[in-house]
Amino acid sequence: WTDEKITALVRRIRAAYPDCAITLSIGEKSRQAYQAFFDAGADRYLLRHETADCAHYGKLHPPAQTLENRMRCLFDLKEIGYQTGAGMMIGAPYQTADTLASDFAFLAKLRPQMVGMGPFLPHRDTPFREFPAGSAEQTLYLLSLVRLMLPDALLPATTALGTLDGRGRQEGVLSGCNVVMPNLSPMAVR
């Protein structure tokens, strides 16, 4: 999809549903594209920062993707006026206590309106297939810290948390999450 097609689609959705929030999560774009989507009627944009540590970011992404550009995107979104969502996977490959401290410092600086945090889940078709899954317990603990740090943020209890622990989403709510996103797709097409 081109930026122009997305802009046109957002404009049509806004015209048909003027009272609904329109949330986009379509990755890194130019400031001009973000502005066009916003002007067409988009309200929210989700773009996980993934890590605020440059060396860690380099281990998770191809060389063409940079932490500097990811940060530029997030600050552009905030400056334009979006309700902005950031976040990271907990227990991601190469993540350390120091990288998590950098993440929390970044969240304190950005002050996003939404924070998406869920446990890392390895997939067999990725370079990270041999890494262990993140911990539900650590994820819940860190979610509670985000709730204390950003008391008004939208904080989802993620599907990944429910995948690791059958009561993960309920525990997420008890840890400070205030958004639940159930998967309503039929099992045959998930």
Positions of the model-derived regions?
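Auxiliary Fe-S-binding modules of radical SAM enzymes
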Residues: 15-16, 108-190
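Core AdoMet radical
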Residues: 1-3, 9-74, 83-90, 113-116
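Alpha-helix N-cap and loop-to-helix initiation/capping positions
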Residues: 1-5, 61-69, 95-102, 130-138
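Catalytic cores of alpha/beta
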Residues: 30-39, 93-108, 162-175
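Conserved mixed alpha/beta catalytic, RNA-binding, or beta-rich assembly cores of soluble enzyme
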Residues: 83, 88, 98-99, 154
